[in-house]
Amino acid sequence: MPRRVMRDVGEMACFLDLAQANGGMGKRWDDIGLGRYGLHNRNKVLAQTSDICESNSAGTYLGLVAFLENGNDIPKSEAGADRLARRIKPLLIAQGMPSFEKYQTYISPEGKSIAPVAVIYEHQFLAYQIGHRGKAGALDSERVLLYPSARFVTEPKLIALSDAGDRLGRLVSTDPALQERAMELGFRLRDADSGLTSVKLNDFLTRHQIPAPVTSTDDTRAVLPDLALLERMIETVGQCDPTGQAVTGQGEPVGTTEGSP
């Protein structure tokens, strides 16, 4: 099994090619040598995400797939977005599960057979490894963090709507205890002087004997389409009802809100 717990994945396009091989039917995990690791899985090669109608991470993954399948470009019109959404739909609709369950399933003992590849946030994986080392005294080398060759970097914003909110914003930026807690949860902190986001987290991870994430500076930065077009594509792929939930063939809503933004 893998010894490194963080690494780049070579080409996201190659992964998508596996999912579309055999005339669109896709490869199975057993087809690409999973048996060499003592495992067997006849499911399709897909990356598991949360409910695409309700999960920000799943919607972002849709945007990543769309960007790559559109020649590293975004759709510019409703007609183009509709065509692209219909084309990538098979790469996404066979993978969703309730949002609160997806991450818990991934870290469960059965996770490697249910979801060999899962789309999660970097901070979730880092927090899991920090907790695992604290409990077991070692990293979980059965799980590896893969960075796609084309990816997004999300930067959450805190917008103060009151004096109390403004004070909270200052505390989050300056209070050592709050910053330490943020790093325990795997979050990067922006350095006020350099503007870099990795230095403090990398130092924290090194102190806790966790390998720090290292990604190539040459990797393609994927771009999301206009928000209205992205929402249109999500609705097309997920067949979402007006409340934002995916619907079954009988029109019954399924899915839940995501527990770890």
Regions inferred by a protein language model and the residue ranges of each:
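A conserved helix-loop-strand patch within extracytoplasmic ligand-binding domains
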Residues: 1-54
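Solvent-exposed coil/turn segments that connect beta secondary-structure elements
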Residues: 3-5, 52, 122-124, 163, ...
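Active-site/pore-lining binding-face segments in mid-to-C-terminal subdomains
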Residues: 123-126, 130-170, 176-180
